[in-house]
Amino acid sequence: MNEPFQVRPADLVGCRFRLRQRWAHPEIGPTPSGESRQAQLEAARELVFAALPTKRAVGDGRRKAFVRVDLPPATTPTELLSRDAETRAAMRRGAHLITRAVLCGTLEGIRVVDEIDVLVRTDDGYLPVIVSNHRVARKDPESSTRMVPTGRLGLGKPLAVRAKPRHHTIDGYRLAMAELLLGDSATGLGASIGQDRERAYLGEVTRFVPPMLRALGAPIPDEPLRLKQCAGCRFWQLCEPRLRELDDISLVFSGGRGDAWRDRGIVTVQGLIDASCGEASVIARSWREGIPVLRRQGPIRVPRADVEIDVDMEAYLDQGAYLWGAYDGAVYRAFVTWDDVGGEAEERNFTQFWRWLMGVRDAAHAAGKTFAAYCYAAGGENHWMKSSAKRFDSVELAEVQAFIASDEWVDVFAHVRTHLVGTDGLGLKVLGPVVGFTWEDDDVDGEVSVALRRAAREGGVDGAAARETLLRYNEDDCRATRAVREFLDAGAPGLPLL
């Protein structure tokens, strides 16, 4: 590479070998899912930039100058260095707001770059503000934090609000790096704008400086290690062949799951097979032989009922659940809203789903029949059922909690983990082919569904197609859940014993 290489805060989180690959292979661009994530983040930035003030309002002293500098995007290292110079020039001019700011420098002898979405002039210096697509704070009557409305950044003072900040390592590293690169203009504070684009939550950032510097100074691995996120990484096409060449144990036990074996000197799949370490060695051998799922010894028991409903939910980020799908073995029903979540539309939709589900249960009981509703990995459904009851008045929280705790709400994944072992996990998409089920849209996952939800709300031909895809995907998840539990109920035929 002819251009100077710079370390970013994102390089310090997750896979550290990615940094080496990014330096050696700049020609490899992001994956489609990576491009989708970037597009979603850019859309979030644009919403924030549109909300930022461009002049003083009545009561701000409108005769006083208000300077906002909007810098163009930068991608290459050379462009980033140029934006750094423009950012610092705008700071010397005393600009009140600088969007798409870039700060470059050297920390611990390492060249770094930090892209800050907004720099805000304060009485003490400049406040870095970052934009993300995760939730950075949650309402909490027992907690207090400070916030500046997005439309008042550069003009208003912080307000105390009842909310509890949510820490994300990458956010802390971005703000900590900015704190050091700002030098004398740093204030010790930073702000984050998350899914609520109207609020910039303030926090003290100096506490993130030591861990950020430790991460920056940590040695970069010489070889790859398989992690959970590898499947969606642009460099997996390079790392997977090398891992197979090394026969690295992380191919079977990814991330920290292989540390115990490494500590014992077992670093390869074959080494684990030869060590005859019980279940782990059997799993390694099965992986080598291309066997995705094994069955544990003993009888398989899965709760069954006279009336059975398979449920799957789709949520938009951390903002709300817009789709509750239900399959009764013959008919799929979609309780869906394409309007904004978090308000009346989501409440009405959840209430309709809940009353329908409870109505089916009550009718079964009245007919002297047993009832059960099933889902695969109930964490998401449980969260949004309880959250919906807490946020809205239509359904009692106690009623939801009682249902979740009852034998009539069954997490199929819990039974899968009891009876099966996967050589590459036990996700629904892993088990589908094993039990003979295929998705019509097998390229859709949780991340893609976020992009589809955005498209679905835009209307037109593309919006209609996105809606159809989301409903089809949700229906297939419901049907796959039923297929998995019926496979278990049949004794998991054809699976080799562990």
Question: Where does each model-flagged region fall?
Answer:
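Generic beta-strand/beta-sheet core signal
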Residues: 275, 311, 374-377
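Metal-dependent nuclease catalytic cores that hydrolyze phosphodiester bonds in DNA/RNA
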Residues: 1-124
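Structural signature for extended repeat/solenoid scaffolds and their inter-repeat hinge/linker regions
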Residues: 281-358
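Conserved DEDDh/DEDDy metal-dependent 3′-5′ exonuclease domain
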Residues: 94-109, 113-141, 147-211, 334-450
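A short beta-strand motif that forms part of the nucleic acid-binding face
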Residues: 131-135, 265, 328
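Acidic, Mg2+-coordinating catalytic module of metal-dependent nucleases/exonucleases
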Residues: 176-198, 205-246, 431-498
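N-terminal accessory regions of nucleic-acid-interacting proteins
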Residues: 28-30, 249-305
